Amino acid sequence: MNVYSKLGPRAGKDFIRSLEKDGIIFDSGNVWITFKAEDLKGKGIYMSRLKRLSRGRLILTKNRLIAIAGGYKIIDLPRRHKLFNKLTIDRNDPERCTIKVDLSLFPAELAGNIFLAYHISPDLLTL
């Protein structure tokens, strides 16, 4: 089972091109990402622990934060949205920028925690 397909829709080339209209501030390009899930529950999915190394992309536009893993859009959140502050962004590791999402805080059919650790220098990303 592809866990990413349960977390979001496919992020194709057309979607990426559409972001250029929003004014891309930062684009990590295709980088390695460590994906972790803890107690992930929802319709058609249950995983107590999962850790996977994939390729992904982190994009910051003027108005949105987009996190892509395995070709699927995991996070697409306006920067001014009240739930944006519920994302935990950890920049303590000099080789990774980690985004933690508690899915129970978001209006969806899923619960649990996911961690997206992008293998980039956290200094590159300014939110």
PLM feature segments, named:
Residues 1-57:
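Anionic N-terminal interaction surfaces
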Residues 4, 8, 110-127:
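Terminal and domain-flanking low-complexity segments
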Residues 13, 21-22, 28, 65, ...:
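Low-complexity, intrinsically disordered short peptide segments enriched in small/polar/basic residues
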Residues 39-113:
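Phosphoinositide-binding peripheral membrane targeting modules
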